[in-house]
Each structure stands twice: as structure tokens, then as C-alpha cells.
């Protein structure tokens, strides 16, 4: 069977699941505090049920068999607190408190919330998906049309390091982009709208012909 979910290892307070789908394999490590029971309701559907009113756990996804988790929830909360404190103290901010328009407070709230949502959903090692992690649009893949819209603002908010994370993808995909350009009769590199982590062409009726994503890389590079 090509789709499997297995209990890779388990003890009194932790377990590791091995997930396999075709040639893709990843591991889910969970460490919890307190008593709990892990049960399988059906294929690929496991439930961890606490046996007390107070329960906490940490979870990690890895592409290789992991070492045992050593951290706990207190450490996770502390690391999160330190990260977001640094995030807000480093970047730009807005203050509409002097605005007389009655919509100013709501607009400020949305600007601040958007900074947070874009940081958690669009600042990874690959160009972001159109709907981030909230929804599963565009076949679950990123497409280069939206890289500018979803990542350029990081540099303008003085958080260029978050944009830089996904810029390396262009260098990794360059050999494939050069081959695509040659195939289509162009010089240089051809960044396709519909692509994937490897840089190859993803299925699309019009993706092969669209060019509006071509200058994004140049524009973003100037921001550094």
C-alpha cells in the first residue's frame, strides 16, 4: 500500500508516527506531559486522549527519523515569546491614533494582524501559496505570480530576512529555469507561474505562457 501511517516508536510520554505517501516520507513526533492514551480510530486517524484535566504537548515534523524530543511546552512558549517580541521590536509599525476617520482603529488592527498572518504563512523557504496555510488553493503549491504580493512587504517593514528565506529558491531552481527558457526559445532563465519546489513546470492551461512573474526576482533583489 502506498499510503501508510505507522507508529514508529512509543513510550509512556511520547510517540513518533511515520507517514508514507508514494515516495514521500515524513515523521510526526509528539511529547506530552501527564497521562494519555493513543488510539487508532481508523486508517490515518489517531487520537491522543488525555486522562486528566490538565494536558500539554509539543509536536515536531521532520523528513528523517527524529531523535527524541527534549523540549517541553514551557520551553516552546518561552521561545515563541522571545521570537515575537523580537519580531515586533525590529520591524516597522503604524499608529493611526491621531486619525479622525472613524475607520482608523479598525484599519490599524487589520494592518497589524496582516503582518502577523503573513509572517506565519508566507515567510518560509519557498515562495508562499496564494492562500498561505489557511486554505489549500492552487493544488497545494505556490505559484510565482504571488511571490511579489506576499513577500516584498517584509523588506519594506524592515524584515528583509523573512523575504530572504524564499529568495534562495531562485538560485536552486536556476538550472531548470534555464532549460525551460531554452526550450521556449528565450535567453536567460524562465520562471514559470505554475511550478513546484524543484522548479519544474506544474500542470496549467495557461501557466506556460504567462510572463508577469518574470521581473519579480529583479525587483525583490534590489530591496536588499
Say what each PLM segment does.
Residues 1-141, 160, 170-178:
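Acidic/polar, glycine-enriched structural segments that form the non-catalytic walls/loops
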Residues 139-224:
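Aromatic-rich carbohydrate-recognition surfaces in CAZymes
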Amino acid at each position: 500500500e502506498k499510503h501508510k501511517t505507522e507508529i514508529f516508536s512509543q513510550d509512556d510520554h511520547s510517540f513518533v508516527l511515520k507517514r508514507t505517501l508514494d515516495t514521500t516520507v515524513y515523521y510526526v513526533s509528539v511529547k506530552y506531559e501527564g497521562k494519555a492514551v493513543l488510539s487508532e480510530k481508523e486508517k490515518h486517524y489517531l487520537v491522543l486522549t488525555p486522562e486528566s484535566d490538565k494536558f500539554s504537548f509539543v509536536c515536531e515534523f521532520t523528513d528523517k527519523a527524529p531523535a527524541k524530543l527534549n523540549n517541553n511546552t514551557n520551553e516552546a512558549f518561552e521561545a515563541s515569546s522571545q521570537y515575537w517580541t523580537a519580531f515586533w521590536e525590529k520591524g516597522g509599525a503604524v499608529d493611526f491614533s491621531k486619525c479622525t476617520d472613524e475607520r482608523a482603529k479598525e484599519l490599524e488592527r487589520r494592518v497589524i494582524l496582516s503582518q502577523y498572518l503573513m509572517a506565519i504563512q508566507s515567510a518560509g523557504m519557498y515562495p508562499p501559496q496564494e492562500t498561505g496555510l489557511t486554505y489549500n488553493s492552487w493544488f497545494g503549491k505556490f505559484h510565482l505570480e504571488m511571490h511579489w504580493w506576499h513577500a516584498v512587504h517584509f523588506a519594506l517593514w524592515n524584515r528583509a530576512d523573512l523575504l530572504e528565506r524564499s529568495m534562495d529558491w531562485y538560485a536552486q531552481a536556476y538550472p531548470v529555469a534555464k532549460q525551460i527558457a531554452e526550450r521556449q526559445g528565450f535567453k536567460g532563465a524562465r520562471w514559470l507561474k505554475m511550478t513546484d519546489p524543484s522548479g519544474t513546470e506544474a500542470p496549467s492551461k495557461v501557466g506556460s505562457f504567462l510572463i508577469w512573474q518574470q521581473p519579480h526576482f529583479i525587483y525583490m533583489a534590489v530591496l536588499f
